[in-house]
Amino acid sequence: MKKSILAIAIFAITLISSTEISAQKFPKLDLSPLDAASYPSSYKISDKVVKVVYGRPQLKGRDLAKLAPNDKVWRTGANEAAEITFYKDVVFGGKVVKAGTYSLFTIPASEADWTVILSTARNVWGSYFYKQDEDVVRVSGKISTSEKSIEAFSMLFDKNMTLKMGWENTVVSVSITLAGSED
């Protein structure tokens, strides 16, 4: 009888401790969640040309120049550097780029076009370890002004496959076409 009670007690303690060990502690929602944009943008079209995955920081009353300093390489988003995947060879800002996945960095400028960089480095946290010798291309991102302030950093591809990056009142555009179709 004592052995049965002891066995049941050991079983109960084991069961209780095993449920505590296996209980998952999920993290809170990231304040700068990841987002993605693709072209074509319709989820019904599976034959994509390009997709970009990036973190979406928010202004929250802060100045864009403090979050993405002028004349310094920026991760183009929050947390990890943005990554862009081309499923086909493209012409990115006038320069041919082979199909593949690249980190997307930018160098903001206050009064001029931004520099947009595709790098072979991948799975990179921020721009802390950016190396210019890993650049595939550097192109000019044309600047325009948004009438409405854009609170969360955003990227999209318009109907012409132009990459648009917007934050605060700044919109940076880089043309993309399929390689061989630039005629």
Spans of model-derived segments:
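Primarily secretory-pathway and cell-envelope proteins
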Residues: 24-75, 124-183
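A broad, low-specificity signal marking well-ordered, structured residues that form hydrophobic/aromatic
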Residues: 21, 50, 82-84, 116, ...
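Residue-level signal for beta-strand positions within conserved beta-sheet cores that form or flank
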Residues: 19, 112, 135
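Short capping micro-motif at the N-terminus of alpha-helices
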Residues: 6, 52, 99-100, 174
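Bacterial Sec-dependent N-terminal signal peptides
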Residues: 1-26
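Mid-length scaffold segments of soluble, non-membrane domains
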Residues: 74-124
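Short, charged N-terminal helix-start/capping segments
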Residues: 19-39, 86-90, 95-100
